[in-house]
Amino acid sequence: MSFLKLFKQFVVTGFNKKLLFLSETTCWSYEIQPDLPLEKCRPKKYFDADSDSDEESTQQPQKPPTNGNGTADNVQIVALEVHEGKSLLAVATSDKSLFLFAIDPEGDETNKDRLKLLSRRMVSRTSSCMKFAASGKFLVVCDKGGDCYRYDCDDDDCKKPGRWLLGHMSQVLDVLVPDNERFIITSDRDEKIRVTNHPDCHSIETFCLGHGEFVSQLEFVTAKDGKSRLLSLSGDKTLRLWDYETGKEVARKELSHPGNRFAVKQLLDGTLLVAVLFYEPTEMAIYKLTEVESLTSETIQTLKTNQNEVFSSFAFDERNNLLSLVVDKVTEKISLKWYQFEQENCKFNDLTPNPLEKLFFDNTENDKISYVDSVSFLFKKKFDNLKDYQERKRRRIVEGGKYNYGGRM
């Protein structure tokens, strides 16, 4: 797995155990150490989430978790988020750890002061997604079991255990927190988008229902009336717009293939640029949405990878350029692509070579990353039980015919 985020003038990438901060002139790296100190408190489950007692305070300090085979050698980054306002970086790893760092890009050249570890806390299961609240006061972490936890990020609370917020019956694939922090919005493998009140998460505000397959990603967009809407992407080949406070579907756009991930950039005139990565991650379609409320759009470009390569993580920068990590499935090499936005013709040009690409290559030349198909298993499994029943019935009739009239044939 690999991740790409933007933080001020830096492009932040994460894969294996490695973090890279890149600008056009500099690059510095950090490697997650599995033996870093671990807070002794476990996350509070649903049955004690409302309790203020620190029932874990008497426990012995926890041993660093492992990857399941007794070692921490193969620990990998499974989720990554940044908060620009508070200069925070959150990293979840495969050993069920949540690292919270303070970022100081002006630190010394040894990188020791550029990333300061604030805490390493435990999560109940392997994380599937996470998001910072707009204020940066807390982080919502969701796991593959369907549970969502709140982890405080303020200086005084950043070492406290996670507190259970809500749960789904299936894997949570994405989570959002609006600016007013009134809701926690989650999507899951079972086609549902759930809008839960916050902090009273026992109360569900509404569901946004209509997708026929897993809902892989969510994003807020702003309509012309200034109201916030919810954009969702699904494996049912649709992109949908919702009034998430009422659960009403506002508009939908049919896609040519099941959706995997997307990136959204809203221009000053209200136009949306939406880059959609399909189920087969060798193609990325870029749409220009001129009317947000109706999802009126045109396909302005389709980007394709070279042979054996697949798009991984991608994002728009502040200049509307598109940045993407690309993985070669054969050589297991990872590279960074930079597509420059040409506003006059509304298209993206592949800038190869470019300073970012070279810096990334120089700092990852000896790294390898295995490509993992994380989408196929999300589709609903279909079983044709009727056909099996009819076949068994036919066999019984054929076999029963041998003993008609009480005699042998």
Swiss-Prot record:
The keyword GTP-binding does not apply. WD repeats lie at residues 72-111, 122-161, 167-206, 210-252. Signal peptide: none annotated. Pathway: tRNA modification; N(7)-methylguanine-tRNA biosynthesis. Residues 58-72 have a biased composition (Polar residues). Coiled coil: none annotated. Keywords: Nucleus, Repeat, tRNA processing, WD repeat. Residues 48-72 are annotated as: Disordered. InterPro entries: Trm82 (IPR028884), WD40/YVTN_repeat-like_dom_sf (IPR015943), WD40_repeat_dom_sf (IPR036322), WD40_rpt (IPR001680). It comes from the Eukaryota. One of its GO terms (biological process) is tRNA (guanine-N7)-methylation. One of its GO terms (cellular component) is tRNA methyltransferase complex. It is found in: Nucleus. Its main location: nucleus. Transmembrane segments: none annotated. Belongs to the WD repeat TRM82 family. Forms a heterodimer with the catalytic subunit. Required for the formation of N(7)-methylguanine at position 46 (m7G46) in tRNA. In the complex, it is required to stabilize and induce conformational changes of the catalytic subunit. This is tRNA (guanine-N(7)-)-methyltransferase non-catalytic subunit wuho. It comes from Aedes aegypti.
